[in-house]
Amino acid sequence: YFQRSELKQKEGTSMWAYNETFYQIYPIGFCGVPVHNDGVPAHRILKIGDWAEYLGNLGIGSIILNPIFESDNHGYDTRDFRKIDCRLGTNEDFSEVCKKLHSQNVKVILDGVFNHVGRGFWAFRDVQEKKWDSPYKDWFHISFDGNSCYNDGFWYEGWEGHFELVKLNLQNPAVVDYLLDCV
């Protein structure tokens, strides 16, 4: 907890966020999605759009949505940064939700995790399949001299020791370019 008066504007930042009332939603929980991604599409994210008028009436200026990208389980194990998790719906569903929120003057902020990805991330899957021959092997911190706890035939760095969260090599310009292209 902190007082708004304690916030100091950093040089070059927009002032709107310092005076905003934020509302945070973890869509995977809020929308009641299955814990594990079974690939079955559902239009659950539309539930957030149903709350747009209520949020506007509360005086909410911005909504923070925890990860909504295609993921293996909890959202922080991203498979695809360009696609809404099928358990939540489609990119078109998300666009509709944004329009409803914007009609109530509610901004949308996405929680994007760009430090690591899930084991289902397309480039990591390519490394699992092709090993040394994968053009994406340098996208991760990998050693072909060891083995992972998943018996991949190579060792890799997982975020904070969590090997379902594959750490990206952010020193690789191709990785950075890919991530910037996604945002």
Name each model feature, range by range.
Residues 4, 10-180:
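Acidic/aromatic-lined carbohydrate-recognition and catalytic surfaces
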